[in-house]
């Protein structure tokens, strides 16, 4: 949620910055007009309440003097009726203001590239392991290079057919070494983040609608969520929701900041509007595992912490020796709550393209305002914290990248060295028979 006081004082700037995010400036005019009406009403109500107090005093005085107070009593009733009418009007205005404000995205940080969509994203850096060039398919696409889902099916470790039979499209079973590889990947990720000072959590996977509102998924993205029928609850689209809401409504001790959490969770997404995209494989599923990172920071530290969190995600890819690049998203491609976002995209040799594997964002105080998460600054004034979140990483997409980047011509897949301790020293995935 944006700061309405800032919007009042800086309406021209806010209109310009939100126009970069796709918001019609007239929407801001409408919001500020309703806000002004609401404030005028509040003043009227306060004035009437003062008048009511005066009349009440007059009635009490008249009664003490045994004088006729009927006129004052009538006046009192009229003032009471006027207050009630204005209160109802104010409630309606409050709802209208809230409804518009709840649909406004965050303003982008000033250094974010301005543009309508992903075409305006800017590459920050790219990385590939030195030995990557010696992999046979790294420099030119070898004829035997297969897509991760073909490799997984040939090895008997990914079963999309039975996933579809039991649950529908975009679901799968990990089988045998596939399940072990997925587990190895997320345990490795969690261990790395723990070493970087993140507290590991296991969170609920069903949250209240208020939690979805707090992180900015609701009200705008309800169509993409799996709702629990008959309850105001939702299956989480990311562990960002329960992790960030952990402190909703709380004041955090200043000396504890930054606070860093990490969690593995299943994520559930309807993928509304993705018909025809990535219909095969692990890239776009309705249910997938993801390791999430979340931070609560002081405002002056949040951008330094954003850079650190991005490096924490990159660290995983570097230790897995997977090539990637980092891009900063433009104003037209950023998520609803973000003020600045880095996407990390991993190299997928069969598609000959980089694919998103992590998104790391600073939401500044946008989420904290919705959730009322505060701390006291050096002057002992209550301030909103800044919240950050990032994937560290999407587990299925990491498995997909490993299968494609570590595949061998004989159909086997070499297991990255850092994962071998999690797989009892196993060095390769080879075809197995299962029914």
UniProtKB/Swiss-Prot annotation:
It is found in: Cytoplasm. Keywords: Aminoacyl-tRNA synthetase, ATP-binding, Cytoplasm, Ligase, Nucleotide-binding, Protein biosynthesis. Pathway: Aminoacyl-tRNA biosynthesis; selenocysteinyl-tRNA(Sec) biosynthesis; L-seryl-tRNA(Sec) from L-serine and tRNA(Sec): step 1/1. Its EC number is 6.1.1.11. It catalyses: tRNA(Ser) + L-serine + ATP = L-seryl-tRNA(Ser) + AMP + diphosphate + H(+); tRNA(Sec) + L-serine + ATP = L-seryl-tRNA(Sec) + AMP + diphosphate + H(+). ATP binds at residues 269-271, 356-359. GO terms for cellular component: cytoplasm. The keyword Nucleotide-binding applies. The keyword Nucleotide-binding applies. GO terms for biological process: selenocysteine biosynthetic process; seryl-tRNA aminoacylation. It comes from the Bacteria. Its main location: cytoplasm. It is an enzyme of class 6 (ligase). SUPFAM superfamilies: Class II aaRS and biotin synthetases (SSF55681), tRNA-binding arm (SSF46589). Homodimer. The tRNA molecule binds across the dimer. Consists of two distinct domains, a catalytic core and a N-terminal extension that is involved in tRNA binding. Belongs to the class-II aminoacyl-tRNA synthetase family. Type-1 seryl-tRNA synthetase subfamily. Catalyzes the attachment of serine to tRNA(Ser). Is also able to aminoacylate tRNA(Sec) with serine, to form the misacylated tRNA L-seryl-tRNA(Sec), which will be further converted into selenocysteinyl-tRNA(Sec). This is Serine--tRNA ligase. The lineage of its organism: Bacteria, Bacillati, Bacillota, Bacilli, Lactobacillales.
């Amino acid at each position: 949620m944006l700061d309405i006081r800032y919007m009042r004082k800086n309406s021209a700037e806010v209109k310009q910055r939100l126009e970069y995010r796709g918001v019609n400036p007239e929407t801001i005019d409408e919001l500020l007009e309703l806000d002004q009406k609401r404030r005028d009403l509040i003043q009227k109500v306060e004035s009437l309440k003062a008048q009511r107090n005066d009349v009440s005093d007059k009635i009490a005085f008249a009664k003490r003097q045994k004088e006729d107070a009927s006129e004052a009593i009538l006046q009192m009733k009229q003032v009471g009726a006027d207050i009630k009418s204005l209160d109802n009007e104010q409630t309606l205005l409050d709802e209208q203001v809230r409804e518009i404000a709840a649909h406004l995205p965050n303003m982008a940080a000033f250094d974010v590239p301005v543009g309508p969509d992903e075409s305006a994203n800017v590459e920050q850096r790219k990385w590939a392991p030195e030995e990557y060039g010696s992999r046979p398919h790294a420099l030119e696409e070898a004829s035997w290079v297969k897509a991760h889902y073909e490799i997984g099916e040939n090895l008997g470790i990914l079963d999309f057919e039975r996933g579809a039979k039991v649950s529908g499209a975009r679901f799968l079973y990990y089988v045998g070494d596939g399940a072990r590889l997925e587990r190895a990947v997320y345990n490795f990720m969690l261990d790395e983040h723990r070493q970087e000072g993140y507290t590991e959590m296991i969170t609920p996977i069903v949250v209240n609608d208020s939690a979805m509102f707090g992180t900015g998924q609701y009200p705008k993205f309800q169509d993409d969520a799996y709702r629990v029928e008959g309850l105001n609850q939702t299956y989480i689209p990311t562990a960002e929701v329960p992790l960030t809401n952990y402190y909703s409504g709380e004041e955090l001790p200043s000396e504890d900041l930054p606070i860093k959490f990490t969690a593995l969770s299943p994520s559930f997404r309807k993928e509304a509007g993705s018909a025809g995209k990535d219909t095969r494989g692990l890239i776009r599923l309705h249910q997938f595992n993801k390791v999430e990172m979340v931070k609560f920071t002081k405002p002056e530290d949040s951008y330094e912490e954003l850079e650190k969190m991005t490096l924490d995600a990159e660290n995983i890819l570097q230790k897995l020796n997977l090539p990637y690049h980092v891009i900063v998203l433009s104003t037209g491609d950023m998520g609803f709550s973000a003020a600045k976002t880095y996407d990390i995209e991993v190299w997928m040799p069969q598609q000959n393209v980089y694919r998103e594997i992590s998104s790391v964002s600073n939401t500044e105080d946008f989420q904290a305002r919705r959730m009322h998460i505060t701390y006291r600054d050096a002057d002992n004034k209550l301030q909103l914290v800044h919240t950050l979140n990032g994937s560290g990483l999407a587990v299925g997409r990491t498995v997909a990248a490993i299968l494609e980047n570590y595949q061998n011509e004989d159909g086997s897949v070499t297991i990255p060295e850092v994962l071998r301790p999690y797989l009892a020293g196993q060095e390769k995935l080879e075809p197995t028979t299962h029914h």
